[in-house]
Amino acid sequence: PLWGLPGNEKAKTGLSNDMTVGNIAELAQDDSIAFRLRCEGEAPPRSAMYYRGPVLSRLDGQKWTGSGFPRAPSNQQQAERAPAGSAADTVRYEVLLQPHQMQWLLTLDVAVTPPALPAGWRSLQMASMEWTSHRPITDVLRYRASSQLNYHADASIPAPYLRPYLALPPGLNPRTRELAQRFLN
């Protein structure tokens, strides 16, 4: 999600580590360019251009934050064997990412292989399938990536890796908790 970055008097829309309930309405819109993307060959339709950045998967009742869990090696191997889209669904592209002071590498959803970064840069895929760099993006960064637009994750991902995405905040309305449990079963 593209949310508020702490700034001068008012936050601007941008990448953030968290989002608090009710604060999104207070964000000032920022028309500056966040990144540019150039596809090899034909670009996918706009409706397929969902960009994966930070995934805010934990809610404490008031604030969403990211889980920060890197993928386990066995989970990575499962993802590589998972049924993905056809070769026709693979999009290869180049990203020119503007500095955002965070570590996220924006990719079309879902980049199942590491983005090709310049020398001296390393990437890590998180459990939520977002890609991060080993250091904050403080200058313009150019990299190549490839994504499968119709990717489907392996349904046999171990429960410990799913738990953060299924957790409910404390103090939740009992009827809401009951409904959530029905969804999980």
Briefly describe each language-model feature range:
Residues P1-N185:
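Helix-boundary/low-complexity linker signature
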